[in-house]
């Protein structure tokens, strides 16, 4: 009997264990099929917000933190947002939860919750704090489902966004500083177009004045010397506006609205002076070397070269606004302001070298168009400035001057450890574009022979304006240095001597200093000139990494590209045999140049003969001649007044 009872008990225990396992499996499956994000609703958002009424207890904060984390976006979703995609896989309950949660908290309640999370000093607390910032940024993005966007933000956030008084000390202390801390800790989630634009505007407005003038400090501490601002307050102010710029700049559509003064639907930004605001953002002495400011434009390269029609169109819009704003000499002359950004006359590239690099990045998809190429032919019909050709030439020279104004001279700096300046990088890019243009000319030699001349023309024009930009930046820098000395009366003479030495590499007429440096009858590029110059004035142009030296070497990039496009086979016993690898492919031009022991002009002639196509060669030569003329026509580097009159101040 006892054994019977025991066996039945064991049987029941086994059955119970089996049922328990089934229940656990069902629960686990439920969690897999319906993760926490799917169970969150608008009611949960209101309930969680109501917990703030009597202050946040540890348990309440932890409860809300877990819900916020559950409502967060995945890394994949964030990346798709950054790519400009519309998210259709964010549960409606999550969208409504965020709306109700943030919408039922005032600013003090929200900021106190962040303080609660941060004060925990635990991994969970840090994770919840980040989820809190990310949730607000996510709610602002109209690409998150159908229940998010600027209009879904709390009313106090929208009121703050539309307060454009950058001298409102109370607002800065009570809202700006803690809000920047909140959204600055939001991972990489991008804001929506409107909110992102307002964040960039806040940053630019803040950049227009110093911490001393902003009213950041409490009124009682503003007595006495207004410039005795504690370092901590000044640092906090800079950190605040940089965070707004960083978060706002995550949105390419917001950056485009800021650069153009219009939202994507064509609506103009309210109370917005585009030139002033962009100028504030670019001229400010950012403590990150202009990295955050550069994020407003550096994405243009990737979008412009993506081949995605939507992204290309956005890049074209943004670059159109950037080009118009930064190169204009009409009205208040924004270009002059950017070249003289502070009381010392420093250019933006010297103040913010990362910004100069970002301008270079943004310009790369448009190099051929900047010197007269057809926008539609080169895949950027959205960038088609309605500007006369001669003014387009001058504007391009101004853009290249801004890029070259970073003033590194090839020396390593904290911001640029490899020692390559943006201007030097730009000229290398121009030579690379020359190779690509040559390759296209070679590929089309049989089907579209007329294209060779236009491609050569664009390439030569581009090289000329690139050199003009290098010269313009150096001229401006040395003029600024002279203005800071007591030798003002000697400044004009000194600058004329500098111009004389630089002109050897910028004109077709050989300068005595260039003879022996380049091929006979050709001019050396300006960075190869010796330090000595007329009047013993040192000229310190940057060094081009891997770039050309003599004019012959610069032109060689075009012919080399044509050889690559033609896919010719070298004749046995000729110099050309040494230019090819065993697999029949051309060696990199840098290798060919380094292996060649003779004159660069001789090598250029050998490459021209190797083309084996007299018509193609004639077209390349004719286009190069025309392009060189165009590049010099509106910028005479032998005349020091030319920079002031035509480049800095605009044409008459």
Language-model region placement:
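Long, contiguous all-alpha helical interaction modules
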Residues: 288-652
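General "foldedness" signal
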Residues: 213, 258-262, 373
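Sec-exported extracytoplasmic/periplasmic mature domains
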Residues: 249-253, 507
């Amino acid at each position: 009997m006892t054994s019977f009872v025991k066996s039945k008990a064991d049987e029941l225990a086994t059955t119970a264990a089996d049922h328990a396992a089934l229940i656990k499996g069902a629960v686990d499956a439920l969690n897999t099929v319906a993760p926490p994000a799917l169970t969150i609703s608008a009611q949960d958002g209101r309930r969680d917000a109501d917990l703030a009424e009597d202050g946040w207890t540890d348990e309440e904060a932890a409860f809300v933190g877990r819900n916020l984390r559950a409502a967060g976006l995945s890394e994949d979703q964030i990346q798709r947002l950054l790519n400009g995609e519309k998210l259709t896989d964010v549960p409606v309950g999550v969208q409504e939860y965020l709306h109700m949660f943030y919408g039922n908290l005032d600013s003090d309640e929200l900021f106190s919750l962040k303080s609660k999370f941060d004060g925990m000093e635990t991994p969970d607390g840090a994770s919840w704090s980040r989820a809190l910032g990310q949730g607000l940024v996510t709610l602002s993005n109209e690409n998150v489902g159908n229940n998010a966007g600027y209009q879904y933000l709390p009313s106090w956030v929208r009121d703050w966004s539309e307060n454009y008084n950058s001298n409102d000390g109370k607002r800065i202390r009570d809202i700006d500083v803690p809000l920047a801390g909140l959204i600055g800790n939001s991972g990489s989630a991008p804001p929506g177009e409107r909110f992102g634009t307002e964040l960039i505007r806040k940053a630019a407005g803040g950049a227009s004045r110093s911490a001393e003038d902003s009213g950041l400090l409490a009124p009682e501490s503003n007595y006495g010397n207004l410039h005795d601002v504690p370092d901590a307050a000044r640092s906090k102010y800079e950190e605040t506006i940089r965070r707004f710029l960083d978060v706002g700049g995550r949105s390419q559509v917001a950056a485009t609205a800021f650069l153009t003064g219009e939202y994507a639907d064509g609506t103009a930004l309210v109370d917005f002076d585009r030139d002033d605001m962009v100028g504030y953002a670019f001229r400010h002495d950012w403590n990150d070397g202009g990295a955050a400011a550069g994020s407003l434009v550096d994405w243009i390269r990737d979008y412009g070269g993506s081949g995605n029609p939507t992204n290309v169109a956005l890049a074209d819009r943004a670059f159109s606004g950037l080009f118009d704003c930064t190169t204009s000499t009409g009205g208040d002359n924004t270009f002059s302001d950017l070249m003289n950004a502070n009381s010392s006359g420093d250019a933006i590239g010297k103040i913010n070298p990362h910004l100069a690099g970002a301008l270079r990045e943004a310009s790369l998809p448009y190099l051929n168009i900047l010197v007269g190429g057809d926008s539609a032919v080169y895949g950027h019909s959205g960038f088609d400035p309605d500007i006369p050709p001669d003014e387009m030439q001058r504007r391009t020279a101004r853009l290249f001057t801004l890029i070259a104004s970073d003033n590194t001279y090839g020396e390593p700096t904290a911001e640029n450890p490899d020692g390559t300046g943006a201007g030097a990088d730009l000229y290398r890019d121009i030579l690379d574009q020359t190779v690509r243009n040559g390759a296209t000319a070679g590929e089309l030699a049989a089907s579209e022979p007329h294209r060779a001349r236009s491609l050569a023309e664009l390439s030569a024009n581009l090289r000329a304006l690139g050199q003009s930009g290098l010269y313009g930046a150096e001229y401006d820098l040395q003029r600024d240095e002279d203005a800071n000395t007591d030798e003002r009366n000697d400044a004009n003479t000194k600058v004329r001597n500098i111009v004389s030495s630089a002109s050897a590499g910028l004109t077709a007429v050989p300068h005595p200093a260039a003879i022996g440096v380049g091929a006979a009858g050709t001019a050396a590029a300006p960075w190869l000139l010796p330090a000595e110059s007329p009047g013993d004035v040192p000229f310190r142009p940057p060094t081009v990494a891997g770039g050309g030296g003599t004019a012959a070497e610069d032109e060689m990039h075009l012919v080399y590209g044509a050889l690559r496009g033609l896919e010719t086979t070298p004749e046995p016993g000729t110099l050309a045999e040494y230019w090819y690898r065993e697999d029949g492919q051309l060696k990199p031009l840098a290798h060919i140049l380094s292996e060649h022991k003779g004159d660069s002009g001789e090598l250029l002639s050998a490459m021209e003969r190797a083309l084996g196509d007299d018509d193609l060669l004639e077209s390349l030569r004719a286009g190069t001649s025309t392009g060189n003329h165009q590049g010099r026509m509106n910028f005479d580097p032998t005349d020091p007044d030319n920079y002031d009159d035509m480049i800095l101040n605009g044409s008459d």
